[in-house]
Amino acid sequence: MMQIKRLLCKSCGLGTLLVAVVWLLALLFYSHSLRSSIRSAGWRIDEGNATPRAELSYQARVTVGCTPNASITTGESPAAPKPPSDPEQLELLGVVRNKQDKYIRDIGYKHHAFNALVSNNIGLFRAIPDTRHKVCDRQETTEAENLPQASIVMCFYNEHKMTLMRSIKTVLERTPSYLLREIILVDDHSDLPELEFHLHGDLRARLKYDNLRYIKNEQREGLIRSRVIGAREAVGDVLVFLDSHIEVNQQWLEPLLRLIKSENATLAVPVIDLINADTFEYTPSPLVRGGFNWGLHFRWENLPEGTLKVPEDFRGPFRSPTMAGGLFAVNRKYFQHLGEYDMAMDIWGGENIEISFRAWQCGGAIKIVPCSRVGHIFRKRRPYTSPDGANTMLKNSLRLAHVWMDQYKDYYLKHEKVPKTYDYGDISDRLKLRERLQCRDFAWYLKNVYPELHVPGEESKKSAAAPIFQPWHSRKRNYVDTFQLRLTGTELCAAVVAPKVKGFWKKGSSLQLQTCRRTPNQLWYETEKAEIVLDKLLCLEASGDAQVTVNKCHEMLGDQQWRHTRNANSPVYNMAKGTCLRAAAPTTGALISLDLCSKSNGAGGSWDIVQLKKPTEAEGRAKEARNSDKAL
């Protein structure tokens, strides 16, 4: 082809002009055909999705997601209302008072990867903070607005029963009944005893909702196929997929439905607030969007620079290259038109990236709706595997790469070092789907949807800011107190006795009692997030069932979050474990560990919070003068 073009160029300039005209007409015809096929099916999109406006061809300010101290803008109003419930009550919900509490906590972490004791104690419903920005509409919706009705599809496998019921209850309590067509539960062949018998009847009795439909798979199908099973049973205008460990916030559904009503080829995604897996504390998420790396792993990243200039910008919606996949709304008929999910994908993993590529490349869009907020329990691990132990993430990612990424799939294969002989199944049906929908190529996606993604071998986008990184030991924290932890009735203090490594205390060092002295290994600094930090370097951590150590501050709270009364004779309580600090004996060198708080209230478990006096300005100036004299 190149040789033919060269001959044409040599023969005459007119040939070059003709080639250019032919190419231009072909491109115009392709664009018109694609947009016509979308419109002929009745799908509406923002015109900016088909040909991005200049102001949307922006570069990312930061390309890493949610890293500590990264430049992230939150959508929380400065005057956001506080949660109606007393925070101290929430803190006490995880207290382990006896062996039964400990069993519930431990079995919850084993089966669900979160604190089931706290979840049980919260109950069916609770107040949570309204985390929307102040510009979001808080006026009640009426039927006159004529929004489409929604079918909620919630799939689960071996979910914690109280958490599942609360997920449904929040939908019922915070959704206008005329907008809620039904809730469809798809049980992916759960085998936990509490879920095996009479679950549907129990849910109907506790939740008192007649349009609750229950489907139980005859075998494990996985999240991906289970969602399609639920979607095919739905009758609402809009499908809303929700995970089974969530709490929806105030007026969460209306903004999603408004967007889909105006753009029915758009997948509408709420902002996903954070529910701590250890403490169930509900906190607002920053406004971020979805991206991915060349390993096809989803990641959060900042909104492009200049997105949020004035308060009205916080209404959104914002374009997002990918979505996390756990929570989103889509027109039901458009979901079918788009090809649902890839039914040959197994269990979990990669389906969110696949549907993200497919939506954008086939004429749709993904947008984050900041005035819709849904809290989600973010777990540190996935508590289940595939039935046969297969690497479903790898298989699913290979399928999406070979269908949607064209030659760019080679970057994924090289990144993951995938053998060429790895079996990812038959993809012929998905390739036919791509052809039928007249989808764009992956080069178009990279240029128009995700230009910030660095392609290996290409020059980096210069207008994109480099990732912000701060060493963990030098990050700025807001310290609110400085003290020693003295065992009540003694002159012994909690201390770390360990050698320093490169000038820092050794991570993983345990605590023991030592004679109280104002030395760095006994000085504790408390942050506004209730972290207790040794010498402003390492965080006190409940690192095992009973072990207490100092470790790198991960800033995820939970096992590094502590409570005390700030005075004498106080228990020191860990929020994640629900247990308290206790010394083995009131002697020098005695190990400090975690124990039931009921035991810790006695000998070995009560602590005096010995606050250190801050020097006056005069004392500070005198110290500086002495240091200057020494320097001279």
From Swiss-Prot:
It catalyses: L-seryl-[protein] + UDP-N-acetyl-alpha-D-galactosamine = a 3-O-[N-acetyl-alpha-D-galactosaminyl]-L-seryl-[protein] + UDP + H(+); L-threonyl-[protein] + UDP-N-acetyl-alpha-D-galactosamine = a 3-O-[N-acetyl-alpha-D-galactosaminyl]-L-threonyl-[protein] + UDP + H(+). Residues 147-259 are annotated as: Catalytic subdomain A. Residues 1-6 are cytoplasmic. The chain crosses the membrane at residues 7-29. Residues 526-632 form the Ricin B-type lectin domain. Its EC number is 2.4.1.41. GO terms for biological process: open tracheal system development; protein O-linked glycosylation; regulation of Notch signaling pathway. GO terms for cellular component: Golgi apparatus; Golgi membrane; Golgi stack. Residues 317-379 are annotated as: Catalytic subdomain B. Glycans are attached at residues 69, 264. Residues 30-632 are lumenal. It is a single-pass type II membrane protein. The human ortholog GALNT11 (AC Q8NCW6) is not able to rescue lethality caused by the SF32 mutation. This is Polypeptide N-acetylgalactosaminyltransferase 35A. The gene is Pgant35A.
